[in-house]
Amino acid sequence: MAGVWSLSLPSCLLSLLLLLQLSRSYAGQFRVIGPGHPIRALVGDEAELPCRISPGKNATGMEVGWYRSPFSRVVHLYRNGKDQDAEQAPEYRGRTELLKESIGEGKVALRIQNVRFSDEGGYTCFFRDHSYQEEAAVELKVEDPFYWINPGVLALIALVPMLLLQVSVGLVFLFLQHRLRGKLRAEVENLHRTFDPHFLRVPCWKITLFVIVPVLGPLVALIICYNWLHRRLAGQFLEELRNPF
């Protein structure tokens, strides 16, 4: 009986030590959680990519960063309580900021300033605590600030107010013409002194031209403006592709 106890006691102690070691290792583990949906931003605006650890814990002493594929380009890196700007990819230098007001709760966010078309795509956020590291994916969608403008919208914007204005002017013109014909017929001799004699006999095609021409002018101008804006944005995008740094 004493022999059994002498054999079982060391094995029990060994099991307890293993359990303690496992509990310590699991106590330092966590998960990294991203926003779960794409973050959208306009060209030239700012974008914030949030990231947190679960369960929440103080991440001040951890290494926190964002990188992009390919080649794991460093977008932003926080280590030893400081931002490591020297390790950033050249295209992100001076454009990123780590928002760490809630880092004591394990919550941070990456702010990207002056967003470019080339910033669109996937990002990886990671937290590293000594030798343990977890990460999560974050996606950024960059949108054209004039994405809602198209020729159909331009036509609608131009036509509706201008058409209402021109219809109103045309109706007033026809009303005055009819009234002058009926009421001032007897005074036509006097009217000839102040009005063109052809004023009371304006052909329909002239009235139509009078109504349509002012509508087409602003519409053409808006379409030209729309094409210019899109060419400018496309040129900016191509320039970023040629000179990413």
UniProtKB/Swiss-Prot annotation:
Claim: Disulfide bond is one of the keywords in the record: yes
Q: Which Gene3D superfamilies match?
A: Immunoglobulins
Covalent S-S links between cysteines: 51-125
- Which organism does this record belong to? Rattus norvegicus
Supply the alphabetized keyword list. Answer: Cell adhesion, Disulfide bond, Glycoprotein, Immunoglobulin domain, Membrane, Signal, Transmembrane, Transmembrane helix
Q: In which tissues is it expressed?
A: Found exclusively in the CNS, where it is localized on the surface of myelin and oligodendrocyte cytoplasmic membranes.
| Positions on the Extracellular side per record topology | 28-155, 230-245
- Record's function text: Mediates homophilic cell-cell adhesion. Minor component of the myelin sheath. May be involved in completion and/or maintenance of the myelin sheath and in cell-cell communication.
What family does this belong to?
Belongs to the immunoglobulin superfamily. BTN/MOG family.
Glycosylation, residue list: 58
- Alphabetical list of PROSITE patterns matching this protein: IG_LIKE (PS50835)
Subunit structure, as described in the record:
Homodimer.
Any single GO CC term annotated in Swiss-Prot or TrEMBL for this entry: cell surface
Q: Where is the signal peptide?
A: 1-27
GO biological process entries: cell adhesion; regulation of cytokine production; response to folic acid; response to lipid; T cell receptor signaling pathway
- Membrane topology note: Multi-pass membrane protein
A Gene Ontology molecular function term for this protein is: signaling receptor binding
Name this protein carries in UniProt:
Myelin-oligodendrocyte glycoprotein
Q: Where in the cell is it found?
A: Membrane
Any idea where the Ig-like domain is? Answer: 30-139
Which residue ranges run through the membrane?
156-176, 209-229
**PANTHER family (alphabetical):** BUTYROPHILIN, MYELIN-OLIGODENDROCYTE GLYCOPROTEIN
Cytoplasmic side of the membrane: what ranges?
177-208
